[in-house]
Amino acid sequence: MVTIRADEISNIIRERIEQYNREVTIVNTGTVLQVGDGIARIYGLDEVMAGELVEFEEGTIGIALNLESNNVGVVLMGDGLMIQEGSSVKATGKIAQIPVSEAYLGRVINALANPIDGRGQISASESRLIESPAPGIISRRSVYEPLQTGLIAIDSMIPIGRGQRELIIGDRQTGKTAVATDTILNQQGQNVICVYVAIGQKASSVAQVVTSLQERGAMEYTIVVAETADSPATLQYLAPYTGAALAEYFMYREQHTLIIYDDLSKQAQAYRQMSLLLRRPPGREAYPGDVFYLHSRLLERAAKLSSQLGEGSMTALPIVETQSGDVSAYIPTNVISITDGQIFLSADLFNAGIRPAINVGISVSRVGSAAQIKAMKQVAGKLKLELAQFAELEAFAQFSSDLDKATQNQLARGQRLRELLKQSQSAPLTVEEQIMTIYTGTNGYLDGLEIGQVRTFLVQLRTYLKTNKPQFQEIISSTKTLTPEAESFLKEGIQEQLERFLLQEKL
């Protein structure tokens, strides 16, 4: 008979217990009560967090936005056509985040940071939360470096600094996107990473922007985040935050970034749609009560970081569309109060052929003047004053026919100044070219020319100065000041070119 030894049995049991490895996973699940219009109502999910990602049985991801006593309101990040009533949903324990890396440069992606340009996957080792807190007061420093847009009207009178938020506002078809894309083109060689976020636009418009950036070599330093008009409202609402997360990644790595949100009116409409479907109480213009917070938490992420954090910056150019020039509507007033100034584009000026159609009278930059270079300040003050006086005189001149000589001269000067502010699309000017152009206008060199000759003369003058007076550009770029020496080079160049030009015109 086999003897059973108790110590052997206990050793075997002990070994088995030590080797026993059963992992227990607790999954927070729920059941779909109702689904439709990009919204799902879920029963269960007791411990879900606000903003947490949830996963449906067939793979769709959603965000839990409404936590109510008996159900959870989830917005879907997809069409949700395969989700069935009664199917299960599980909480993931994560909140929305995207992968980030240098590899995103030159690519077109969607709000979930997936490439949509057909050029394969993007490799990334790091990730960032889509919604992350803005830098605090101690983490920032005041704006002091200029961000040149390449547009004379903006860089001289409504200057933008790195780390500023400047709103571009105007009716549809007034050139808002053109101002933004020209600014991206002007960052070539300036070591600025650009992020262009297209929200709720036609796919053809986005393709046009991407093509124009590619043709001019600007996609090398640009990321395009696009959620077109046929995208679910949830993704249109998320797209700006995705763009901000990508720009922040570069900002915290001591680089300068420029982000364009085109446009925030469409994001607000997508958010309104989501909120109404979630049965949140509507407020003014049927927008939910927290629509201000929607934009403020986005735009506050733009900053100029302190020297301890590496002095990186994120400059935001949000775009807002108005209806027949009504700046006092809900979304425009909200965004105006959040930003550090606005560039107002007028349909009347646009139709009158003044492009970019910037209404200098009501456009302001609240912090940009600190970022202007000294040379620009020296010439821009006079331009601003003369244009303001011209606008006033022009209104009076409509009523009186007999004007004295001084008034006639002032009107003629104003018309020529307005002419020199006109620029073709995708033709940004360097700051030296802008200074030279403004100086020519404010010092009366254009007064003897016909209005139709002004632009031709200025184009020839820029070429002439570049080839024959390169010292002018060298002095401005090295000292950032219009020194007496630079001024004398400039005067000589203008005089010589003016004589040549008038001689050509006579022939």
Curated annotation (Swiss-Prot):
The record marks S363 as: Required for activity. The modification Phosphothreonine is found at T257. It is a peripheral membrane protein. It holds the Pfam family ATP-synt_ab_C. It comes from the Eukaryota. Belongs to the ATPase alpha/beta chains family. F-type ATPases have 2 components, CF(1) - the catalytic core - and CF(0) - the membrane proton channel. CF(1) has five subunits: alpha(3), beta(3), gamma(1), delta(1), epsilon(1). CF(0) has four main subunits: a, b, b' and c. This is ATP synthase subunit alpha, chloroplastic. It comes from Lobularia maritima (Sweet alyssum).
